Amino acid sequence: MARIVPPTRFPDSVAVSYSRSINKLISELGKVTLSVYDEQITPQIKLQKSRDDNSFYKLDAPLDVVQRAVDVIKGLSLGIFNSSVVQKTASKFVNSLNLFNKNNISNQGKVKGIDPTVSEPWLESFMKTSISENASYITNIKDAYLANIESIIYRGVKNGSSAKKVRDQLVERVGISRKRAEFIAVDQTGSILGQMTAKRHKQMGVSKFKWLTSNDEKVRKTHRDLSNKVFSYADPPSVGLPGEDYRCRCVAIPVFGDE
């Protein structure tokens, strides 16, 4: 009786762990932001609200205080999102993903007496590129966050918004950054997994794959239409390999020549 080839699996746990690691940094930066805001900017806003005229907008001093506070937040962000931490976070993610996929595809190959992971000359360069790209994604989250909170604070001060209203917007901004981190975690897990799977499948002589979705409510219609259909690695569908489309959790099941 022929042995059944283990299915290609999507590593949800790796994606969740990566998202949590990035969100830990975001939460830390969010706490620092609110602390500096409460201590240095809130008093300036309350001082202005207590005045009857608009002299606040005619004076440079209060805005200078705000600028210094924003600069403090930016400086502290460099300690939280320092290059070593960012690199370590990206590296841990990519290495965990590689280990997961390597074990998964090796088990598929064993059914046919093949081990595609014995020699992988492409892997080192692929890993370095993936780690570098993800380090950039993490840094970009920080940069976008800082640009947005600076805009929120200055707009609030100039428009005469209450300290609470501005603070609420800062809290909301943290939530937006967290959602961005979750998107990147799933998106990158799928993309890197799809490319690793394709390389390892081709390494063991597999030229075709069957598209398989995660079979849940999040699957988009275009991917449901591809499910269980067989494609050539040399000529994949227009959306690319399983996992390459944005936030895709689909996988490629190997189709061996004797099937």
Where are each of the predicted segments found?
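N-terminal leader/targeting and assembly helices and adjacent pre-domain segments
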Residues: M1-I176, F256-E259
